[in-house]
A protein has these predicted regions:
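Flexible, low-complexity linkers/stalks enriched in Thr/Pro that connect modular domains
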Residues: 43, 92-94
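An amphipathic, aromatic/His-enriched active-site/gating alpha helix that lines ligand/cofactor pockets
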Residues: 32-39, 57-91
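Short hydrophobic/aromatic beta-strand micro-patches
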Residues: 11, 55-57
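Short, surface-exposed ligand-recognition loops at beta-strand->loop->(often short) alpha-helix junctions
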Residues: 10-22
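Generic recognition of well-ordered alpha-helical segments
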Residues: 22-26, 78
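Active-site-flanking beta-strand signature of metal-NTP-handling nucleotidyl enzymes
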Residues: 3-10
């Protein structure tokens, strides 16, 4: 089953979430080369500029889980940590009709 992942990041000290964009672009450039990657979208909250939401789509949950364990992803994600006021929130959903 296709998998959608909502990734929410909130920057610290009122810092605009757009500071995360170079890191997100770098992560996506790596993700597009991973097995099972379908697409990704990035949203910046207009009412709360410190908040960013990424929606990532994968062909299977297993592909997403493999990506989460990728050492390069872990390193790039760690580069964003200095900007974050809270822990990155991941919510994984199945895509489709039952």
């Amino acid at each position: 089953m296709a998998t959608g992942v909502l990734i929410k990041r909130v920057t610290s000290h009122g810092e605009d979430a757009k500071v995360l964009l170079p890191h997100i672009v770098e992560l996506r450039a790596l993700a597009v080369r991973q097995p099972g990657y379908i697409s990704g979208e990035t949203f910046f909250n207009l009412d709360h500029p410190e908040e960013c939401l990424v929606i990532s789509r994968w062909t299977t949950l297993e592909h997403w889980q493999q990506w989460m364990q990728d050492p390069r992803r872990i390193e790039l994600d760690g580069n964003m940590e200095k900007h974050l006021g809270t822990k990155t929130e991941y919510n994984v959903y199945g895509i489709g009709l039952w």
